[in-house]
């Protein structure tokens, strides 16, 4: 999974009074993980509330790692998690997004009339200079760790865990959960990618419905 973005032309000054406003403070919030006291920014995109930062909860195992085992990357990118560590890492009241939830977020974000591609709306301005980061999602390119334990793609692409519950085609009973990294951006397009399966990837969460 990789993200390649061509820089946009500099925006011209706008005088139109009907211009879509940037995000307001009311659309942002905070969440404190009571397990370790970490405070996260949150953002609202459509009807969904997302963590606006990568998860940083430390596990008492090797199921979470810092990129290249170098803590200079931690504050910005958080931990990379293995599939085995996901359930323990997620705090109460939040969940790993499904394929449908990622698709819903992407579809809503791309409604912006100024949206060249979804990264121009949800990437951090530090990563993509031309991004408006309108909703405060602030996606960062945290890279991944592959099956050979090699770290790769830092500052180039973002890889996030996604979950799907399999359904028996006959009984329609919900079966095991399937985990994979899900969001792929390339040449201005985006799609769910269930072929990209690194050993460790970043985590963003969606707030449970109230």
Spans of features found by a protein language model:
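Conserved positions within compact, well-structured domain cores
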Residues: 3-5, 13-210
């Amino acid at each position: 999974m990789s993200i390649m973005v061509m820089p946009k032309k500099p925006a011209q000054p706008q005088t139109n009074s009907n211009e879509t406003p940037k995000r307001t403070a009311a659309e942002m919030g905070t969440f404190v993980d009571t397990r370790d006291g970490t405070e996260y920014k949150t953002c609202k995109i459509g009807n969904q509330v997302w963590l606006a930062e990568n998860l940083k909860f430390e596990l008492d195992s090797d199921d979470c790692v810092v990129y290249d085992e170098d803590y200079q990357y931690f504050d910005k990118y958080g931990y990379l998690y293995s599939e085995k560590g996901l359930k323990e890492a997620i705090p109460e009241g939040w969940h790993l997004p499904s394929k449908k939830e990622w698709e819903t977020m992407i579809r809503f974000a791309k409604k912006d009339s100024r949206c060249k591609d979804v990264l121009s709306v949800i990437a951090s301005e530090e990563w993509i200079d031309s991004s408006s980061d309108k909703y405060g999602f602030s996606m960062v390119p945290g890279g991944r760790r592959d099956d050979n334990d090699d770290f790769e793609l830092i500052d180039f692409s973002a890889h996030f865990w996604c979950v799907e519950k399999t359904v028996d085609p006959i009984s329609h009973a919900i079966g095991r959960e399937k985990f994979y990294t899900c969001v792929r951006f390339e040449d201005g397009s985006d799609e769910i990618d269930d072929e990209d399966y690194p050993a460790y990837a970043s985590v963003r969460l969606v707030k449970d419905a109230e």
